[in-house]
Amino acid sequence: MAPRCWRWWPWSSWTRTRLPPSRSIQNFGQHFSTQEQTPQICVVGSGPAGFYTAQHLLKHHSRAHVDIYEKQLVPFGLVRFGVAPDHPEVKNVINTFTQTARSDRCAFYGNVEVGRDVTVQELQDAYHAVVLSYGAEDHQALDIPGEELPGVFSARAFVGWYNGLPENRELAPDLSCDTAVILGQGNVALDVARILLTPPDHLEKTDITEAALGALRQSRVKTVWIVGRRGPLQVAFTIKELREMIQLPGTRPMLDPADFLGLQDRIKEAARPRKRLMELLLRTATEKPGVEEAARRASASRAWGLRFFRSPQQVLPSPDGRRAAGIRLAVTRLEGIGEATRAVPTGDVEDLPCGLVLSSIGYKSRPIDPSVPFDPKLGVVPNMEGRVVDVPGLYCSGWVKRGPTGVITTTMTDSFLTGQILLQDLKAGHLPSGPRPGSAFIKALLDSRGVWPVSFSDWEKLDAEEVSRGQASGKPREKLLDPQEMLRLLGH
């Protein structure tokens, strides 16, 4: 069978090979292992949650062996495909992950889609414990008329496009319009707005893809509206991202002072990070800028603004019905107090002309395998402190454990906790004590199914190729976008 990357035939067409439990698995383990028995642990997903979980396990158990399985050919998940190209400092965590992957007690297997190429049950048969750390691969749908029109994209797909996620490499967003609307007011929304409005020359030394950079050079987008259902007090972005927007070269902010009336008194008792954020918003919206800042704003050719108390109702089509030409927003007001605050429509609506609509209302996880419980409402694997409910030996960490919230350090803390819980269970004898074959059996299964796992040393070859291609244009790297090209470069 020829090597492959993108799977197109149904799982049901394969002859399933299952590792027999009990005596057969014991014999298999004895056959493949003449070394001292060690805890064999499998981690599914190589983003921050996966690597931080692996790091904790390796650090706190001197004999544990951890195998990391990843659907993509390359590691690092959202650090590679989600972090904005103009935030290289955030990507420095890759250095730590690389040291983990180079451990002689850790192995990386890319190009392996768990739930498709191998089942979770097969992993559980082969390992003492399995940790699901596969993140949130999908986006929350708007569920409004017109969402399917050309010119409407999820922010997740747009981010994947400019960051080189293979599945989004052919997105080709039309940037010939004057106005873009981003629905949602979190950090991802501000990342997308910033990339749309940043002078392309400021991005040419980043790891943004050449295709995206070329499209941004031709972009006619001059105005970006960032729309939220609730008010300033409920924004989800943080002060660093807001400050970057305010200081963005060649742009000016558009904030309505009326949106901030009475806010000064309401933030007095707020926690310090939220208070600082609100104070920056207030100053930007209500204070007269200094001479230098006023001159900068007056000369700006692009603008961005925050629209509060607006909820999307419909994407409006162009006269010929072939693409998005605007969005209808319901005016809202707030009901409730504190965390229970919710936006309710007032009955008024307004239409906002635009040619590009980007939905940034959240990511969500997908169920990975029929054998794994999944809560579709919360978008998580049901768990207690990382232990998957009713499935002994199965754990989870990161977004699939708690939902798609927080920053990388939040995921680090969460993943360390899952690792700690797993090691406690191991010490208490709650996990299988007999030998397990680990990757030896899984690699045999994958080989029988025509799947070529990509090792970490393979990734380092691809990494060197990307860095080499980037040097020609002064970039840190030029990302490889085509999985088939990657496999060819590796000789598969």
Curated annotation (Swiss-Prot):
Known catalytic reactions: 2 reduced [adrenodoxin] + NADP(+) + H(+) = 2 oxidized [adrenodoxin] + NADPH; 2 reduced [2Fe-2S]-[ferredoxin] + NADP(+) + H(+) = 2 oxidized [2Fe-2S]-[ferredoxin] + NADPH
GO BP of this protein: cholesterol metabolic process; electron transport chain; steroid biosynthetic process; ubiquinone biosynthetic process
GO cellular component, one term: mitochondrion
The UniProt record lists the keyword Oxidoreductase: yes
Protein localization: Mitochondrion inner membrane
Transit peptide limits: 1-32
Pathway: Steroid metabolism; cholesterol metabolism
Enzyme class: oxidoreductase
EC number: 1.18.1.6
SUPFAM superfamilies (alphabetical): FAD/NAD(P)-binding domain (SSF51905), Nucleotide-binding domain (SSF51971)
Pfam families: Pyr_redox_2
Cofactor: FAD
Annotated binding of NADP(+), by residue: 185-188, 229-230, 241, 406
Subunit: Monomer. Interacts directly with FDX1.
Family statement: Belongs to the ferredoxin--NADP reductase type 1 family.
Protein name: NADPH:adrenodoxin oxidoreductase, mitochondrial
Lineage: Eukaryota, Metazoa, Chordata, Craniata, Vertebrata
Gene name in the database record: FDXR
